[in-house]
């Protein structure tokens, strides 16, 4: 658009009707001129007529920019009165015209008149009000437009025209015509009745474009500065290379630096890491190969350039196939399998899902580590495992700072470089055995690794730049979480993997272990056949564990024995049944624990939970002449000692109900012992068997040898819930005990125990100490006996 000075025609009076010239993609403002290219035949005739008549027309923006022929509904209701100042016919038959606008009009009753539209027009008077605020807005717009003209490289006479605008609205239209606005925004400015609102809107639009221009200018200046610096660096580097060449040194260094720079160019990595690498390459280029720091710098660059910054393995997201793979590799473990399949299902819906942080907790040999490998195979990812057992130095996790001699990254970064992928399945084995000393606390360093809100920018001390661990699927394993700090435990999704029953071990042996061990020893089904009765005999008489490692070792012994027999000339297949197991493995190693013990008053069977699974414990008590002392042995922890004290206090308080003479306690010293004295023991779950053993000792009533019990006691006589119910039930079953007593609040935990196990066992629920005494103590030889009410 141009200014009024270029010849806008002013017409005296305004006709009632005007022919309409619709504009596409533009708006013509009052007091401005606009060059137009007219291609449509109807509007060429209109231009001819108006130009010959020296007449007027209504110049209005078209709503639908795509429409070739505008209808009444396609044009806006407000436009300008225009006249054709100049008309030039082109060689292709089209017209080039210049239209000047005089004033703003409103269109009414738009109708079709032959090839073009016409409408009744009504002049819209311009708002010429003034105020200090309007003057300030106009001044601000003038100054901003001057800056805009400078940044946008527009002709300077445009700025002069804006400065010389006589009226605020004239300034508004002049500035708006040179801004990059949409038709809707341009039309809204034209239709604004108030000067103040128009000034504010145009100032807003201009400020928005000024910000873009200033940003573009800053970027251009920055790029120019970088280019100038690179040219200068290149010139100086060439000079340095020439000097070194004259001195006979540095040619190999230059080639090495160029090779590293080429590797960096081809590598996709974060900007911060790239900046660190570029800086180190530049530093390396200034060093002599004989300098002590040269190899340190070179090793650091190798680590930076070989990290899998953007290298990922594609996930194999097939939930059904994943279920098949998990079932092929592991028997049971339904809770873990369900969690992995849920993760895959969500990953199928949300591709940028952060990797879960799982923690498998259970006894040794239940398949925690192998489960991680199976998960990696299911996902199609690489598998990485590090053992944290005995790790005491924080640098093992975070790495050493490069200032130290022999510095290396931590084991997290080392592992990722080794597998060459930024989304492996990363197993942190034995997390419960991590240590701490004067060199730092590795468990605190793991807080950042295992926190989804932080590990996207994990910083290794050696690398010195963040590495994104959010795509890594971390799996921690441990036997017991008691030693794991609460903050670290809170960051992990703990999934408990209990021990296996004899039936489950049999299935695992049949489906996995027998085939694996026979193959490991070069045997086939033509050489050996191991019967189910033989496997059960090994499970019951030669192993006592929650997992299957001892079972696997014993099966390996059977296979070695068979391989020896075949090597000596025996013909296969050799059938192994239960009767042949003692000949191979020797005498039976484990009998039911209750069957191996002498019984009498003062002995009760309890259930304990250890990192290796559940097991039976025996509470033994004896009374000697004394003065009421309580002696505790068997490496008991503080909690277990307190349970013994509470049990004795309860029995003394209810001596009358139990038909015990009160003086008996004052005349006797009581000794409580828990066998396996070399093994430390602690926990509240021995409270119930302790009170039973003490009551049996003082009353002379024997305890049933076919029952085991667990539960914490209170001085008021309540039985409180304890942990590890499934493991304890399995331990009782392994030991041949088919009747157990558990706290009432733990009955809900029986849902984790298979139905076939519960059907074979009798489980009593305990609410008070009265319940356990009534169930566990046999009647007195002298009389029926009684138990206290609590």
Curated annotation (Swiss-Prot):
Pfam families: AAA, Lon_C, Lon_lid, LON_substr_bdg. The keyword Nucleotide-binding applies. ATP binds at residues 362-369. Residues 598-779 form the Lon proteolytic domain. The keyword Transcription regulation does not apply. It is an enzyme of class 3 (hydrolase). Induction: By heat shock. One of its GO terms (molecular function) is ATP binding. The active site is at 685, 728. InterPro entries: AAA+_ATPase, ATPase_AAA_core, Lon_bac, Lon_bac/euk-typ, Lon_lid, Lon_proteolytic, Lon_Prtase, Lon_prtase_N. Residues 18-210 form the Lon N-terminal domain. Disulfide bonds: none annotated. Keywords: ATP-binding, Cytoplasm, Hydrolase, Nucleotide-binding, Protease, Serine protease, Stress response. It catalyses: Hydrolysis of proteins in presence of ATP. It is found in: Cytoplasm. Its main location: cytoplasm. GO terms for biological process: cellular response to heat; protein quality control for misfolded or incompletely synthesized proteins. SUPFAM superfamilies: P-loop containing nucleoside triphosphate hydrolases (SSF52540), PUA domain-like (SSF88697), Ribosomal protein S5 domain 2-like (SSF54211). GO terms for cellular component: cytoplasm. Its EC number is 3.4.21.53. ATP-dependent serine protease that mediates the selective degradation of mutant and abnormal proteins as well as certain short-lived regulatory proteins. Required for cellular homeostasis and for survival from DNA damage and developmental changes induced by stress. Degrades polypeptides processively to yield small peptide fragments that are 5 to 10 amino acids long. Binds to DNA in a double-stranded, site-specific manner. Homohexamer. Organized in a ring with a central cavity. Belongs to the peptidase S16 family. This is Lon protease 2. It comes from Syntrophobacter fumaroxidans (strain DSM 10017 / MPOB). The gene is lon2.
């Amino acid at each position: 658009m141009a200014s009024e000075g270029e010849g806008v025609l002013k017409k005296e009076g305004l006709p009632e009707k005007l022919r309409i010239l619709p504009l596409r993609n533009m708006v013509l403002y009052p007091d401005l001129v606009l060059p137009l290219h007219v291609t449509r035949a109807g509007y060429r005739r209109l231009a001819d007529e108006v130009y010959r008549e020296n007449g007027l027309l209504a110049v209005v923006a078209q709503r639908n920019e795509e429409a070739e022929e505008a209808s009444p509904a396609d044009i806006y209701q407000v436009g300008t009165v225009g006249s054709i100042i100049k008309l030039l016919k082109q060689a292709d038959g089209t017209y080039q015209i210049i239209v000047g606008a005089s004033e703003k009009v409103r269109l009414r009753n738009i109708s079709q008149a032959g090839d073009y539209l016409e409408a009744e027009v009504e002049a819209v008077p311009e708002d010429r009000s003034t105020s200090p605020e309007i003057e300030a807005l106009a001044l601000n717009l003038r100054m901003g437009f001057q800056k805009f003209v400078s940044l946008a490289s527009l002709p300077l006479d445009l700025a002069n025209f804006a400065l010389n605008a006589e009226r605020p609205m004239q300034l508004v239209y002049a500035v708006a015509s040179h801004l990059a606005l949409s038709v809707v925004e341009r039309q809204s400015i034209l239709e604004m009745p108030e000067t103040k609102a128009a000034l504010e809107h145009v100032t807003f639009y201009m400020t928005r474009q000024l910000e873009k221009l200033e940003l573009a200018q800053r970027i251009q200046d920055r790029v120019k500065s970088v280019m100038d610096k690179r040219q200068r660096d290149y010139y100086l580097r060439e000079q340095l290379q020439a000097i070194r060449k004259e001195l006979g040194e540095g040619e190999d260094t230059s080639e090495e630096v160029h090779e590293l720079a080429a590797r960096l160019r081809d590598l996709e990595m974060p900007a911060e890491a790239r900046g660190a690498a570029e800086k180190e390459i530049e530093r390396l280029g200034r060093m002599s190969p004989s300098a002590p720091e040269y190899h340190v710098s070179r090793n650091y660059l190798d680590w930076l350039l070989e990290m899998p910054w953007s290298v990922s393995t594609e996930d194999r997201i097939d939930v059904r196939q994943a279920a098949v793979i998990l079932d092929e590799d592991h028997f049971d473990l339904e809770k873990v399998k369900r969690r992995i399949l849920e993760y895959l299902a969500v990953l199928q819906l949300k591709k940028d899902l952060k990797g879960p942080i799982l923690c498998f907790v259970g006894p040794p040999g239940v398949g925690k580590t192998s489960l991680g490998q199976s998960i990696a195979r299911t996902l199609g990812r690489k598998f990485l495992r590090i053992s944290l057992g005995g790790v005491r130095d924080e640098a093992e996790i975070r790495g050493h700072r490069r200032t130290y001699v022999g510095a290396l990254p931590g084991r997290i970064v080392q592992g990722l470089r080794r597998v060459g992928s930024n989304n492996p399945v990363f197993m942190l084995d034995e997390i419960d055995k991590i240590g701490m000393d004067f060199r730092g606390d590795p468990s605190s360093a793991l807080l950042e690794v295992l926190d989804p809100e932080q590990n996207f920018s994990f910083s290794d001390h050696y690398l010195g730049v963040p590495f994104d661990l959010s795509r890594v699927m971390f799996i921690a394993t441990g036997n017991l979480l008691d030693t794991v700090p609460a903050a670290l435990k809170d960051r992990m999704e703990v999934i408990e993997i209990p021990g296996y029953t004899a039936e489950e071990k049999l299935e695992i042996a049949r489906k996995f272990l027998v085939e694996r061990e026979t193959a490991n020893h070069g045997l086939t089904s033509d050489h050996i056949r191991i019967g189910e009765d033989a496997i059960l005999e090994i499970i019951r008489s030669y192993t006592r564990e929650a997992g299957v490692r001892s079972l696997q070792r014993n099966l390996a012994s059977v296979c070695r024995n068979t391989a020896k027999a075949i090597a000596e000339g025996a013909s296969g297949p050799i059938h192994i049944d239960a009767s042949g197991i003692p000949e191979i493995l020797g005498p039976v190693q484990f009998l039911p624990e209750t069957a191996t013990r002498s019984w009498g008053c003062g002995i009760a069977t309890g259930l304990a939970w250890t990192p290796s699974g559940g097991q039976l414990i025996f509470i033994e008590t004896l009374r000697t002449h004394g003065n009421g002392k309580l002696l505790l042995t068997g490496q008991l922890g503080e909690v277990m000692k307190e349970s013994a004290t509470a049990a004795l206090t309860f029995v003394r308080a209810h001596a009358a109900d139990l038909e015990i003479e009160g003086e008996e306690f004052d005349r006797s010293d009581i000794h409580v012992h828990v066998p396996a004295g070399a093994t430390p023991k602690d926990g509240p779950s021995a409270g119930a068997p302790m009170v039973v053993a003490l009551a049996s000792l003082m009353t002379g009533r024997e305890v049933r040898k076919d029952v085991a019990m667990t539960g914490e006691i209170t001085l008021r006589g309540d039985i409180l819930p304890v942990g590890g119910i499934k493991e304890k039930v399995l331990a009782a079953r392994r030991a041949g005990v088919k009747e157990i007593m558990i706290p009432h609040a733990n009955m809900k935990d029986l849902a984790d125990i298979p139905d076939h196990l519960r059907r074979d066992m009798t489980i009593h629920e305990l609410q008070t100490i009265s319940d356990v005494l009534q169930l566990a103590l046999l009647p007195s030889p002298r009389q029926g006996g009684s138990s206290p009410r609590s």
